[in-house]
Structure formats: C-alpha cells, structure tokens
UniProtKB/Swiss-Prot annotation:
Belongs to the UPF0434 family. It holds the Pfam family Trm112p. Disulfide bonds: none annotated. One of its GO terms (cellular component) is cytosol. It comes from the Bacteria. This is UPF0434 protein Nmul_A1027.
Length: 61
C-alpha cells in the first residue's frame, strides 16, 4: 500500500484516519470498528464491503 495514499485516505463514514493491516490486506477504522478490503491494490471504501470487527478483536497501533 502506497504510504502517500494512506496519508490521505480516511474512513468514508466518520472521516477518522485508517490503519493499514498488511497481513489481512485491510484498512481499519478504529472509531467505527470496520475493516475495508484492499483488492488488487485498490482500497474498497464502501460500507457494504467492509467487515465489522468484533469487540473482542484487538486493534493495535
């Protein structure tokens, strides 16, 4: 994931910064507890495509 792109991307719902999880290839919104997938190098920033993170799943960084 391009670091410059990460600097400008925000959560489409709450506008919070996103964390990049390389192993899962996802962008994480800590505020909304959503994981947005990255497919073929393209972040899919649609709420319907996001995975809701369970409360017990730790979000680090």
């Amino acid at each position: 994931m391009d670091p410059k792109l990460l600097d400008i991307l925000v959560c489409p719902l709450c506008k919070s910064p996103l964390l990049y999880r390389k192993p899962e290839n996802e962008l994480i919104c800590k505020a909304d507890r959503l994981a947005f997938p990255i497919r073929d190098g393209i972040p899919i920033m649609l709420e319907d495509e996001a995975r809701r993170l369970p409360v017990e799943e730790e979000i680090s960084r």
